């Protein structure tokens, strides 16, 4: 497990930047350049440093640029392989007082940084997210919610804007009160959700109620069919957040996801038992019924692809 530690960049010189943006990447060169361009095109007048972190891939050093207003640094993940380690690598190299995170297949809209820094200054929040739009195979669906995201909200529902690519966070809080991303989560699955739960437990999260991130989903993702990791990761989320016991709808949701992962592994009887446990918390939980359907023979990949094409996940 990655524990909260002292900010590794505390001993660096005073930063000349308002924001450090960590872009994690793996073998998506064209999309990576688009993600970098979107950050460089931010309307925020102050300087922003961009830190590209390659994970399990050869870095393209030609992307580095020392332009003072929007410089680009290129690193390789020197921590645990995977997205959590990649993001922590970039955060450790950052010098600005505020961190932002972006993946190579996501795009920030031009006024994202300006609006979020403005809201953080107004509210004193240590973490701020924005609404997002999900694009799948050319079709887009918008998602959004209330101006504040509380811990109880995230226990109850996996809010789509509760994701690292929509967030900026005070760097000191990231390393201390909240803590960095846990690198021991199997397959790096649910690392965003687990971190957002910790951030919201620390303090309410401010929400910009406008859409400033385009999440470009790929229907076939490397972890979506890795059911054992999915099962184990969600089990850790429940274990590390005992407060789920007091939120039946939220516990039913996560139990339903675990049931689906179990059934998708071919462990049909265990999947049905876990689905029953989910329904015991809330009979309305749709994931429990999907898990039961898979346990009875409906192909799990077909269910996942069908949901993904509509901008939804399990």
Positions of predicted regions on the chain:
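Short, acidic, metal-binding catalytic loop of nucleotide-sugar glycosyltransferases
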Residues: 37-47
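Short aromatic/hydrophobic "clamp" motif used to bind/position activated sugar donors
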Residues: 99
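Conserved nucleotide-sugar donor-binding catalytic segment
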Residues: 149-228
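Glycine-rich, basic loop-to-helix element that forms the pyrophosphate-binding segment
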Residues: 77-94
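A conserved acidic beta->alpha catalytic loop
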Residues: 38, 54-63, 79, 103
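Flexible acidic/His/Gly-enriched loops in nucleotide-sugar-dependent glycosyltransferase catalytic domains
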Residues: 69-71, 85-86, 115-179
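Catalytic core of nucleotide-sugar-dependent glycosyltransferases
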Residues: 211, 215-218, 223-250, 268-280
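Cell-envelope/extracellular polymer assembly enzymes that use nucleotide-activated donors
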Residues: 17-20, 49, 194
């Amino acid at each position: 497990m990655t524990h909260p530690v002292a900010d590794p960049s505390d001993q660096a010189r005073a930063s000349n930047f308002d924001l450090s943006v960590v872009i994690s990447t793996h073998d998506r060169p064209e999309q990576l350049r688009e993600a970098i361009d979107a950050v460089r095109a931010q309307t925020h007048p102050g300087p922003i440093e961009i830190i590209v972190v390659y994970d399990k891939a050869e870095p393209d050093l030609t992307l580095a640029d020392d332009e003072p207003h929007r410089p680009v640094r290129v690193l390789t993940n020197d921590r645990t392989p995977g997205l959590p380690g990649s993001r922590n690598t970039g955060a450790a190299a950052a010098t600005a007082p505020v961190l932002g995170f972006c993946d190579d297949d996501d795009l920030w809209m031009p006024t994202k940084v300006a609006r979020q820094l403005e809201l953080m200054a107004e509210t004193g929040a240590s973490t701020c997210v924005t609404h997002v739009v999900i694009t799948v195979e050319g079709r887009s669906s918008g998602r959004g919610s209330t101006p504040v995201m509380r811990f109880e909200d995230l226990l109850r529902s996996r809010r789509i804007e509760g994701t690292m690519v929509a967030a900026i966070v005070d760097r000191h809080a990231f390393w201390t009160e909240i803590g960095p991303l846990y690198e021991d989560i199997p397959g790096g699955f649910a690392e965003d959700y687990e971190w957002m739960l910790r951030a919201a437990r620390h303090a309410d999260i401010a929400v910009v109620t406008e859409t400033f991130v385009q999440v470009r989903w790929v229907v076939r993702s490397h972890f979506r069919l890795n059911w054992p990791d999915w099962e184990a990761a969600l089990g850790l989320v429940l274990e590390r957040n005992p407060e789920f016991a007091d939120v039946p709808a939220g516990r039913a949701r996560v139990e339903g996801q675990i049931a689906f992962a179990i059934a998708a592994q071919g462990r049909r009887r265990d999947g049905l038992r876990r689905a029953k446990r989910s329904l015991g918390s809330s009979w309305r939980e749709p994931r429990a019924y999907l898990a039961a359907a898979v346990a009875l023979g409906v192909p799990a990949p077909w269910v996942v692809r069908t949901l993904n094409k509509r901008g939804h996940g399990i």
